[in-house]
Amino acid sequence: FDAFLKKYNNTSSHDLARLHNARVVTANESGISKHWDEERIKEITGGDNVTARHLYKSEFTFKSQIKLWCATNNLPKVDDFTHAFWRRIKVIPFNRRFEGDDRDTNMIDKLKGESSGILNRIIKGFKEWTEAGLTNLPYQVKQAVEDYRNESDVIAQFIADRITDVG
């Protein structure tokens, strides 16, 4: 996860070099009070050429093609409120916990039994995505992104808290 967070004393690109030829990159946990490196996020998710190098190796350039999936309990702080950054962000809330009687201890076997149907749904979803893109996001995702953006905008929060309309 640290490869996508701001570092104030490190400008090396070996983290980027590991993204070469990757399609999906997963990262877990950001920690509290961390900030996105918005420029790096835009660079690696924009489909542009990225210049990087492995440790003690020469630089090389590659076309980034990743989809970044970050699983975290604490969303990193954001300083960039441009459309270029926020169009890349999708917050998918996983609010349900399965404990006690809600926990299905046979879930793996059930999923194995449905594996051909699951694969068919994945293929159908992929075809829909390649034809139409992600235009119809679920309400919960749209709301979570809006909440994240609003919580990140300290200037807007200050104005809402301290400025009153007297007109």
Describe each PLM feature range:
Residues 1-167:
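Feature primarily recognizes SF3-like P-loop helicase cores of small DNA viruses
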